[in-house]
Structure formats: C-alpha cells, structure tokens
C-alpha cells in the first residue's frame, strides 16, 4: 500500500484487528521510507442501491457523504470515529438487506437520523434541523419534546 505522506510503495502492517461489528479489518501501517503510521480499513465491496434525489436525478451511494454529514452533526461531541463507522455500516447493511436497487434520499436521511438518535441527541437535533429544514424555534422545541416523552424520567443529579 502506498504511503499517504511520502507516496512510497513499501509499507508494513503493524497491527490488524476486526472493527465495525466484524464488517471491516482495521490495519495500522508504517511506512518504511518516512516511518510515519497510518490506518487503513478493509471491507467487502457490495453493490449498494442508487440514491434517488428529490429532483429525480440518480447518483451512486457514497459512504463518504454519509460519514461527512454525520461528522458534521457530531462535531465537538464525545463520539468516537469507530462509532460513526459502525453506524454507517448499519445503514449500509439495512440498504443491502432491503434488496432494493434504488433508495430515495429521504429514506437515507431517515436512516441517518435514526443512527444519530442512538449516538447523540444533540447531533440528532442538529442533523434534523438541516435535513427537515427547520424554519423557527418551535420546530426545535417539537423535537426536544419528542425526546422528553420518549426518555424515562431521570432523577436530578446532586452537585
């Protein structure tokens, strides 16, 4: 594998382990030329459905777009990169399991929101505000109220 830092072709695998609920192999590599380390992921490549956008155009499913949108929603939140990768892997699995050749962008957005809801409620609200195009504060209040109804009552923390 080529080093991303110096572009040298000779790198060694330092460590390998299964990650993302068994969906990928995480490898730590070291470049023999510049001695820098980097991480690679090896995963099975499967044919995911095409994404049908709101305007009717079609595009290939792009895992990087899903990861980027989740990272943006999770910015400065205490969620590990592995948790994001696992969430995206679950989305991909759901899409593959559906057996559909196409998925509407709205459905994909809902899958992302479901995963964010499990990872971090703040990120969920951030993503929902953009995805659902919130126009005023009352829409934020509605989502927050939804969480309050769904969450069991918590006892106040002592300070």
Curated annotation (Swiss-Prot):
Can the keyword Secreted be found in this entry's annotation?
A: no
Which GO biological-process labels does this protein carry? negative regulation of DNA-templated transcription
Which species does the entry assign this protein to?
A: Burkholderia mallei (strain ATCC 23344)
Cofactor mode of binding and number, as noted? Binds 1 zinc ion.
Which keywords does UniProt give here? ATP-binding, DNA-binding, Metal-binding, Nucleotide-binding, Repressor, Transcription, Transcription regulation, Zinc, Zinc-finger
Coiled coil: which residue ranges?
A: none
Q: Outline the extent of the ATP-cone domain.
A: 49-139
Q: Name one Pfam family in it.
A: Zn_ribbon_NrdR
Could you tell me which NCBIfam families the record lists for this protein?
A: transcriptional regulator NrdR (TIGR00244)
- In Swiss-Prot or TrEMBL terms, this protein is called Transcriptional repressor NrdR
Name a GO molecular-function annotation: DNA binding
Signal peptide range in chain numbering: none
Disulfide bond entries = none
């Amino acid at each position: 594998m080529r080093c991303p830092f110096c572009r040298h072709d000779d790198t060694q695998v330092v460590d390998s382990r299964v990650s993302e609920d068994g969906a990928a192999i995480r490898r730590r590599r070291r470049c023999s030329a510049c001695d820098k380390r980097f991480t690679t992921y090896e995963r099975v490549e499967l044919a995911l459905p095409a994404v049908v956008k709101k305007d009717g155009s079609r595009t290939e499913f792009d895992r990087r777009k899903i990861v980027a949108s989740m990272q943006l929603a999770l910015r400065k939140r205490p969620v590990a990169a592995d948790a994001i990768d696992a969430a995206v892997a679950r989305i991909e699995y759901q899409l593959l399991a559906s057996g559909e050749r196409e998925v509407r962008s709205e459905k994909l957005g809902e899958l992302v929101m479901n995963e964010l809801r499990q990872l971090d409620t703040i990120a969920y609200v951030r993503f929902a505000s953009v995805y659902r195009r919130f126009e005023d504060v009352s829409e934020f209040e509605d989502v927050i109220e939804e969480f309050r109804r769904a969450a069991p009552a918590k006892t106040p923390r002592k300070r």
